[in-house]
């Protein structure tokens, strides 16, 4: 399969998976808070990833500097970014939170230019402008619509900024490590530990509620 076709397949698969994942998050939000949902997801996925890495381990994968970069990405992405994404779905609903989360290319362009020295072409800049225009349309709110509040719009936008910052650290870490499998494992583990530790600082009602069986389904 050609690289372009393979890239398209991965992009479409990611979009389908994200949509299905968001629906499950919306359903799970009825039984637990956002922090619980993210922590359960990390608890479920990290051990199998670690087992595969252990089974396929190569000596050249040991790189503390790469692990530090990936851990920073794990704090921003799987921990902070995903919690805010779950919260956005709860407060704004799936049909608003998901399109706003799609503003990630906007922040990716900003971070790519500012931190990585990338120079996007006119097509990328035009696409970014369309994203901004779409966000303006999505956030239009009729006066009689009481199902959501504009004061919650910061949640998905800050979450997207966290994910975009995570991508910068992820890119730097993967380039040093040259193993996407190890990278996602380190990020997931770091995100799980950071989220568990930081959740102790949250109000009681926002802390992980792992004792609710329906939240795990």
Over which residues does each language-model region extend?
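Residues that mark transmembrane-helix kinks and helix-interface sites
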Residues: 18-23, 78-86, 109, 132, ...
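Hydrophobic alpha-helical transmembrane segments in multi-pass integral membrane proteins
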Residues: 49-59, 107-124, 161-178
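Hydrophobic/aromatic residues within transmembrane alpha-helices
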Residues: 28, 37, 88, 114-120, ...
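Hydrophobic transmembrane alpha-helices of multi-pass small-molecule transport proteins
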Residues: 111-113, 123-142
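Alpha-helical transmembrane segments of compact multi-pass small-molecule transporters, enriched
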Residues: 44-49, 100-114, 129, 190-194
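Membrane-interface interhelical linkers
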Residues: 1-36, 40-72, 82-92, 140-157, ...
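A helix-boundary/kink motif common to multi-pass secondary transporters
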Residues: 33-34, 93-94, 120, 178-179
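Hydrophobic core positions of alpha-helical segments in small-molecule transporters
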Residues: 40-41, 100-103, 122-126, 158, ...
